[in-house]
């Protein structure tokens, strides 16, 4: 994951100091892309320990179409707590848009199921896209989608995925986002009887928060270690039937974790 450290250094060297919605302040770049060959290892940051439990359970929560934090709390995952209301509700965030996008005619669109169907039956389509950026419902969401739009691409028996992330907290959020969409690509490939290709991450406002600078310096002082491998222990009947126990990360040997405050 040298490319991740390179991005951090590029922000420090070339970024612009900006204000932001949270009032914290950032150093920011606009427009950056990284590519990960998923056959060469699972792209999980090794220069600090990442909380795998949160990454996996959050993705399963998205795929279930859930928008209440109750399931996450049951699994010991607190990453959405700061944005939830007193009942744990978040409004129509990712899970709602992925699984039940409201159409103008009153229909509900399951974008994930449609993507699976297109990959299987129309793999050359240039429209295998899932969007969480529903302009008509942004005001109802506790947090507007940061990882907003992703597209699948099939070539030579391999499935690739590209994510567009409009806003990216590089220190805290980006390692989660890369791992989450890499995991989703593996799952979709398995369901569609394909090998994995590349995960391409494209960022818009790519930033380091001003209160993450010491943590960033510590991480930049560390040498990346070999990437782990992902093992999926079974093939469920559908993309929606995976369980936490189905996944194992092999050979993950990270440096110690680094704590940092979340900008709310």
From Swiss-Prot:
Pathway: Pyrimidine metabolism; dTTP biosynthesis
EC number: 2.1.1.45
KW Methyltransferase (keyword) present: yes
Keyword tRNA processing: no
Pfam families: Thymidylat_synt
Reactions performed catalytically: dUMP + (6R)-5,10-methylene-5,6,7,8-tetrahydrofolate = 7,8-dihydrofolate + dTMP
Active-site positions on this chain: 146 (nucleophile)
Entry GO MF terms: thymidylate synthase activity
SUPFAM superfamilies, alphabetized: Thymidylate synthase/dCMP hydroxymethylase
InterPro entries hit by this protein: Thymidate_synth/dCMP_Mease, Thymidate_synth/dCMP_Mease_dom, Thymidate_synth/dCMP_Mease_sf, Thymidylate_synthase, Thymidylate_synthase_AS
An example Gene Ontology biological process: dTTP biosynthetic process
Binding site for dUMP: 21, 126-127, 166-169, 177, 207-209
Keyword tags: Cytoplasm, Methyltransferase, Nucleotide biosynthesis, Transferase
Gene3D superfamilies: Thymidylate synthase/dCMP hydroxymethylase domain (3.30.572.10)
Residue pairs linked by disulfide bridges in the UniProt entry: none
Residue sites binding (6R)-5,10-methylene-5,6,7,8-tetrahydrofolate per the record: 51, 169, 263
Gene Ontology CC annotations of this record: cytosol
Subcellular localization, as worded in the UniProt entry: Cytoplasm
Subunit structure: Homodimer.
Family: Belongs to the thymidylate synthase family. Bacterial-type ThyA subfamily.
HAMAP family for this protein: Thymidy_synth_bact
NCBIfam families: PRK01827.1-3, PRK01827.1-5, thym_sym
Function: Catalyzes the reductive methylation of 2'-deoxyuridine-5'-monophosphate (dUMP) to 2'-deoxythymidine-5'-monophosphate (dTMP) while utilizing 5,10-methylenetetrahydrofolate (mTHF) as the methyl donor and reductant in the reaction, yielding dihydrofolate (DHF) as a by-product. This enzymatic reaction provides an intracellular de novo source of dTMP, an essential precursor for DNA biosynthesis.
Name of the featured protein: Thymidylate synthase
Source organism of this protein record: Aeromonas salmonicida (strain A449)
